[in-house]
């Protein structure tokens, strides 16, 4: 009986620690992440549109913050699934007026917010 209780408790702990991501999000590196490179030019989004898309897709979704993805493992994931394209993210520092942050999975940069790119969301 004690062993059954122990097994049940271990299973509950395992389930509590596993990350269940919803919709287009993929569980990676203890995060739910969605890389949307939007191949077709007319499907790419401005920074504001990308931010809204993350929020509308799931209420807890936001553009990925640079401080959360600025590590080798996450950047390789973004580079692989983003195929080297520019993708909108949020930066922890306030960029100059009219500029927004992006990454291609290798570097970070700033571009006019009305440029159209894919995006990286985290839920």
Curated annotation (Swiss-Prot):
Molecular functions (GO terms): carbohydrate binding
UniProt key word NAD: no
Gene3D superfamilies: Mannose-Binding Protein A, subunit A (3.10.100.10)
InterPro entries attached to this UniProt entry: C-type_lectin-like/link_sf, CTDL_fold
Domain C-type lectin: 21-122
Disulphides: none
Keywords: Lectin
Stated name of the protein: Putative C-type lectin protein FPV003/FPV258
Phylogenetic placement of the source organism: Viruses, Varidnaviria, Bamfordvirae, Nucleocytoviricota, Pokkesviricetes
